[in-house]
């Protein structure tokens, strides 16, 4: 999970 923050950000979209 290197882009965990990006995953959460895109998850909201």
Curated annotation (Swiss-Prot):
Expressed by the venom gland. The modification Pyrrolidone carboxylic acid is found at residue 1. One of its GO terms (cellular component) is extracellular region. The keyword Metal-binding does not apply. The modification Methionine amide is found at residue 13. It comes from the Eukaryota. Keywords: Amidation, Pyrrolidone carboxylic acid, Secreted. Transmembrane segments: none annotated. It is found in: Secreted. Belongs to the tachykinin family. This is Tachykinin-like peptide-XI. The lineage of its organism: Eukaryota, Metazoa, Ecdysozoa, Arthropoda, Chelicerata.
